[in-house]
Amino acid sequence: MTAQKLDGKATAAAIKSELAERVAALRDQGVVPGLGTVLVGEDPASHQYVAGKHRDCAQVGIESIRVDLPADVTEEELAQKIRGLNANPHCTGYIVQLPLPRHIDTNWALNLIDPNKDADGLTPASLGRLVLNEPAPLPCTPRGIVELLTRHGIELPGANVCVVGRGTTVGRPLGLLLTRRSENCTVTLCHTGTRNLAEHTRQADIIIGAAGSPGLINADMIREGAVLVDVGVSRTPEGKIQGDFTADVWEKAAWVSPNPGGVGPMTRAMLLSNVVDRAERLTADPS
């Protein structure tokens, strides 16, 4: 058996095509969605990610609002910029690009974001609403994973899912999404401290590798015909991206997401979706 590819690039392209039509319809009503980004410092990866997000905006017709700040920005200066986006009527939603410099408290900064404009779905308010099963912007990577699976015809209701990774951007919120009644999965949350990890992964229909531990899961640790989603991002000394699964899983699994080219494009597509979703809600109910 050679696994089929969970193609994030093609799926994200299809979603962006759908979003472009929705944005065009909004523009016909005089509504122009706007995505803002707050970028602090000169981290090359962060600059690359933000540039990609604004390219995506241009492709679907979303306006870009970019706020770039030096690495030594004070908390008060950052707070002023965030409050400015909260008040900006042209900004439908925005993100504060992480990581922030060490002198800036991340949770403090995220708490300043208007929860209704939280395009990443990662503010404490948004995550709290997710726990309570209340309407809120959904975290982009977990939402992208669910969308990637469903658009490839992977049956989620009743599936046993093993999520390996306990981070607040993927592992923890993904479990909340997958256990909603609309997905109805049974989720086991594991991590790098889990004893006998293979005992859990071998029982799973779907495994999400989100630990950021290269080669953590190999073919001996999965069942025949499993569905594997690789979210882990590590880099070799040569700078090559390496995921949480070893290459031999492709010969045993039914579906595997490539890394890169799997979840990454879906995350960016879901960021756009969160912005367009809010623009449509505002059009339906301006109050």
UniProtKB/Swiss-Prot annotation:
It catalyses: (6R)-5,10-methylene-5,6,7,8-tetrahydrofolate + NADP(+) = (6R)-5,10-methenyltetrahydrofolate + NADPH; (6R)-5,10-methenyltetrahydrofolate + H2O = (6R)-10-formyltetrahydrofolate + H(+). One of its GO terms (molecular function) is methenyltetrahydrofolate cyclohydrolase activity. GO terms for cellular component: cytosol. Its EC number is 1.5.1.5, 3.5.4.9. GO terms for biological process: L-histidine biosynthetic process; methionine biosynthetic process; purine nucleotide biosynthetic process; tetrahydrofolate interconversion. Pfam families: THF_DHG_CYH (PF00763), THF_DHG_CYH_C (PF02882). Gene3D superfamilies: Leucine Dehydrogenase, chain A, domain 1, NAD(P)-binding Rossmann-like Domain. NADP(+) binds at G165, R166, G167, T192, V233. Catalyzes the oxidation of 5,10-methylenetetrahydrofolate to 5,10-methenyltetrahydrofolate and then the hydrolysis of 5,10-methenyltetrahydrofolate to 10-formyltetrahydrofolate. NCBIfam families: PRK14193.1 (NF010789). This is Bifunctional protein FolD. It comes from Cutibacterium acnes (strain DSM 16379 / KPA171202).
